[in-house]
A protein has these predicted regions:
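Flanking scaffold residues of small Cys/His-coordinated metal-binding clusters
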Residues: 149-152, 267-268
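Non-catalytic, well-ordered alpha-helical scaffold segments
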Residues: 154-155, 200
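Extended alpha-helical scaffolding segments
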Residues: 1-141, 164-559
Length: 559
């Protein structure tokens, strides 16, 4: 049997070493003192996302710290590979990818030998459909696989198959009648606090047991309460629901909304995996899939995902933050890193722990600041994958005595940028379309470019803010906010000039509309009281007449 705790199947990179190597899960602390493993090295970015969740979930389930005191001890003195192996072994039977008994993330009750051959044929699918962005039946039938072609992943090795299986179950979209979505919805965003080594990354995202107990029913402690494939499946033919009270909290990492069975076959001569390109003892060509798997509802929260409050909700329930089409950038700082009071978005539990609970201990260990890794698919109805988001942003901690001023200043910077972005979009629309036009142009690329253009300066600005506040020297925050506003003003006008006359939006332009829209934009940029109030700045006294005169001035070029 192929066991995911015993086999060396996880691709990683060490501090020194050009080629990736493959390790078993317990080897993540191997060579910490000499040549540590620093990151995952899968052939696909979504597999890296799946593997880090796999490792975090495994440690959280098998050897979590009892409290924060134990967490600190193991951060300073990590367990050896042998110690991890001993802790993981208790759950070894849950990680067989094949065999006659329970199989990793596969339905125990889906007995293929008991199914009529004709019915069995109906639920058999090519293995490429295990990969989320691959074309499905309808797309193939209608010959719409223009970009991602069918038949490009006919052979998948057991290692890539395990990663693909975890990816699907963790991000499961609605795949038709009875195909349930993942425990966090159809497009969950995952946020990971990154460490200096792979072990640090895993451990920084572990929650102590005292805190973790609230995420499920602690009295549900059987293996099947943690790993649903270890017992009979809680199917949902009659819309039966599985709430957080029906399972152990560890199931957040091991959810099984789709009922799947993998078939491993001995490899033929010279057969290589179509994903990683390596030969393997076993390959997967087809798998079996049926509907009405576990229907996760009611109170599930995940420690790696931000949540926002449900509006007009009587029970104060939270909704998992979903991945978006236009990527992840500094505009998501509010919600991913610090609380967003406007949208009532809360960062993931592990981010809160890093910034609020563990920051002093980590500072003493030389880790006062690090990075946040945010990733996830954006999937819409019909299992249509729009994009995979994969972003990294700085994760900074500051002393408690300046944290309020630091966070309120960042809030001002981001909200002011959001206000200008919205006005820019509105004015470009005014420039290219008449008021009577019923067209609805997609200007999302304008917004995306605005965030990309301003991102480096945002990080430079908050770094200056951090250094100034942390050094306890007098610092004129007004000057910093004025510089930020001046930069946004120039970027907005430059973007307007670029796109309002661009053939990529519309083939005909009206000069009068463009001038009027530009005047409107300048009025907002240099005279809107709400914009200046957001930054605690005094609004300059400028008349509309002077604004029109300024149109003749050459705008600074933004490179």
């Amino acid at each position: 049997m192929y066991n995911l705790l015993h086999e060396q199947w996880i691709p990683v990179k060490r501090k020194t070493g050009e080629k990736p190597e493959y390790i078993s899960p317990s080897q993540i602390t191997d060579g910490l003192a000499t040549n540590p493993i620093i990151s995952l090295a899968a052939s696909r970015p979504d597999f890296n996302g799946a593997l880090i969740q796999f490792l975090i979930g495994l440690v959280q389930t098998a050897c979590p710290p009892a409290d924060e005191s134990e967490w600190r001890k193991k951060f300073r003195s990590p367990p050896s590979p042998d110690e991890l192996k001993a802790a993981f072994e208790r759950y070894a039977t849950a990680f067989n990818l094949d065999g006659d008994g329970p199989r990793f993330m596969q339905d125990l009750d889906l007995n293929l030998s008991a199914i009529d051959p004709k019915e069995k044929e109906k639920i058999e699918f090519p293995i490429e459909e295990l990969i989320l962005e691959m074309p499905g039946d309808i797309t193939k039938r209608e010959d719409r696989d223009f970009f991602v072609k069918r038949g490009t992943a006919k052979n998948i090795c057991q290692d890539c198959c395990a990663a693909a299986l975890y990816t699907l179950q963790a991000h499961a979209p609605s795949g038709g009648p009875g195909y349930r979505v993942s425990l966090r919805g159809g497009s969950p965003l995952t946020t990971i606090v990154l460490g200096r080594t792979l072990w640090e990354t895993v451990w920084l995202n572990i929650v102590d047991n005292k805190t973790f107990f609230q995420y499920g029913n602690a009295s549900k402690n059987a293996d099947s309460d943690k790993f649903p494939w270890m017992g009979h499946t809680r199917t949902s033919e009659n819309d039966e629901k599985t709430t957080f009270q029906d399972a152990n909290g560890a199931q957040m990492f091991w959810g099984m909304p789709w009922r799947i069975k993998i078939v491993l076959e001995h490899s033929k001569n010279d057969e290589r995996c179509d994903i990683c390109g390596r030969p393997a003892d076993s390959m997967v060509h087809t798998f079996y899939r049926t509907n009405y798997g576990i229907n996760y509802k009611g109170g599930w929260y995940h420690t790696l995902t931000p949540y926002f409050e449900r509006r007009k909700s009587e029970d104060n329930s939270l909704i998992p933050f979903q991945s978006e089409v236009n990527g992840i950038s500094y505009r998501h700082w509010l919600g991913l890193i610090q609380n967003n009071p406007n949208e009532k978005i809360r960062p993931a539990k592990v981010v809160h722990l890093f910034r609020e609970v563990r920051k002093d201990d980590l500072k003493n260990s030389g880790l006062s600041s690090t990075r946040l890794w945010a990733f996830g698919y954006k999937i819409v109805k019909g299992r249509k994958v729009l994009c995979w988001n994969d972003s990294i942003m700085p994760l900074i901690t500051v002393n408690s005595d300046i944290s309020q001023e630091y966070e309120s200043s960042i809030f001002q910077l981001i909200v002011s940028a959001e206000m200008i972005k919205e006005k820019l979009r509105e004015c470009i629309k005014e420039a290219i379309l008449s008021q009577k036009s019923k067209l609805k142009p997609n200007l999302s690329f304008v917004e995306l470019q605005f965030w990309q253009d301003t991102e480096p300066t945002f990080y430079q600005t908050i770094n200056e803010l951090h250094i100034a506040l942390q050094s306890n020297r007098s610092f004129d925050l007004r000057n910093l906010r004025e510089k930020w506003l001046d930069y946004l003003q120039r970027i907005a006008l430059s973007s307007f000039d670029r796109y309002s006359q661009s053939d990529q939006i519309i083939s005909t332009t009206n000069p009068h509309r463009i001038i009027d829209a530009r005047v409107n934009l300048r009025k907002f940029l240099y005279g809107n009281k709400n914009l200046y109030a957001m930054l605690d700045l005094e609004k300059p006294e400028k008349s509309a007449k002077s604004l029109r005169k300024n149109l003749k001035k050459k705008e600074p070029v933004i490179s």
